[in-house]
């Protein structure tokens, strides 16, 4: 055996041992020998299920990418055979597989063209908490955050329960962020770990994300290809699709100046926070409370709040009593010298051939519109109407 072959074999034996222990936990005889292959493992699973009678049974394979190990083809092939040859014919069996490594699940399960091809009954993607759900989470756990602080926490951590669980209710939000990110970083390696866990060849994905982090309003496919020194071909398309499927980036049309371009924008809150404050030793020497008065904070907060709003479009629809939305995009009325008006969010509602123009501002206090600001808004509306003729 080569060194890597021995390593892969040892990994498979360890995963088979975990699988075997689970079968024992759910009633398999302790006299049953441990399987030496995934074919034997699924044969034992079938025997266990057959001995459980006719009641409804759920087979739940958690973290399938981890279970499969480096040589995943054997497990996937045997899982497909287990399902196609027997399990799919049993009306009382539900098979659930899940995994946090998004690209692996897409390539080996959802887009798999072998035994699992077109076998999925339902796909379920776990989404972060909404802003309202975060508010309820904090309320239930005796946090006394204002809505401004709840929004700020969301902009730093996203609606991810794992990150939210790091917060303590005996600290202010500023103290929590200092402790988690800066003073004693509990998630110092989280950025690298997240991408390594989600994607194979994670360094290529990180390169794309870092470049997108430098361009707050997104980049075209060609701009991304040039920045990461690759071609705008199938490999880049797959990576961009995987990033979008994971909720890390989004795509939207940018209209303006008589042209329409599709751009990719980084929208993962944790990645945005990390790249703005921690990437390449950016960690500030002052506390988070003092940092909130800096130009760096206002630049980050303004952009991130726009993303927060765009990710809560359904709640915005309800507040504005808008029906079905048919389009949503950023508009820039570019002039020849590159300057021009910008509208943060345009919501199209074709039910009444109406466009909602949204100016998004992040402010701790009520944002007052003075005469000059009002005129600037009216000028944007005029430029938008002229552009849409």
Indicate where each model-derived feature is located:
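A cross-kingdom feature that marks ATP-driven nucleic-acid transaction machinery
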Residues: 255, 262-389
């Amino acid at each position: 055996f080569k060194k890597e072959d021995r390593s892969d074999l040892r990994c498979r034996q360890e995963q088979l041992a975990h699988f075997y222990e689970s079968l024992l936990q759910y009633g398999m005889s302790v006299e049953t020998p441990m399987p030496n292959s995934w074919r034997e493992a699924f044969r034992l699973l079938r025997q266990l299920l057959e001995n459980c009678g006719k009641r409804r049974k759920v087979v739940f394979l958690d973290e399938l990418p981890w279970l499969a190990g480096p040589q995943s083809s054997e497990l996937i092939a045997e899982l497909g055979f287990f399902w196609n040859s027997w399990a799919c014919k049993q009306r009382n069996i539900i098979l659930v597989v899940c995994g946090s490594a998004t690209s692996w699940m897409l390539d080996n399960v959802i887009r798999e063209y072998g035994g699992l091809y077109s076998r999925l009954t339902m796909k379920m993607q776990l989404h972060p908490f909404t802003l309202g759900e975060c508010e309820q989470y904090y309320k239930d756990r005796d946090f006394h955050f204002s809505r401004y602080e709840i929004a700020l926490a969301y902009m730093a951590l996203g609606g991810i329960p794992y990150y939210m669980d790091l917060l303590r209710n005996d600290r202010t939000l500023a103290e929590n962020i200092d402790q988690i990110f800066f003073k004693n970083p509990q998630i110092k390696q989280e950025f690298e770990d997240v991408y390594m866990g989600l994607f194979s060849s994670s360094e290529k994905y990180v390169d794309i994300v870092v470049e997108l982090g430098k361009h707050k309003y997104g980049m075209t496919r060609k701009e991304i290809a040039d920045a990461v020194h690759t071609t705008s071909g199938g490999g880049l398309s797959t990576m961009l699709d995987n990033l979008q499927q994971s909720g890390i980036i989004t795509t939207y049309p940018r209209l303006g100046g008589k042209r329409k371009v599709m751009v990719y924008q980084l929208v993962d809150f944790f990645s945005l926070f990390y790249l703005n404050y921690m990437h390449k030793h950016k960690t500030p020497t002052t506390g988070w409370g003092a940092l909130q008065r800096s130009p760096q904070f206002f630049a980050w907060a303004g952009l991130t709040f726009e993303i927060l709003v765009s990710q809560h479009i359904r709640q915005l629809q309800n507040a504005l009593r808008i029906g079905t939305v048919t389009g949503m995009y950023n508009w820039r009325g570019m002039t020849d010298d590159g300057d021009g008006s910008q509208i943060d969010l345009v919501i199209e509602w074709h039910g009444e051939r109406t466009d909602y123009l949204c100016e998004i501002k992040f402010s701790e206090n009520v944002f007052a519109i003075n005469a000059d600001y009002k005129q600037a808004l009216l000028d944007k509306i005029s430029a938008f109407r002229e552009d849409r003729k």
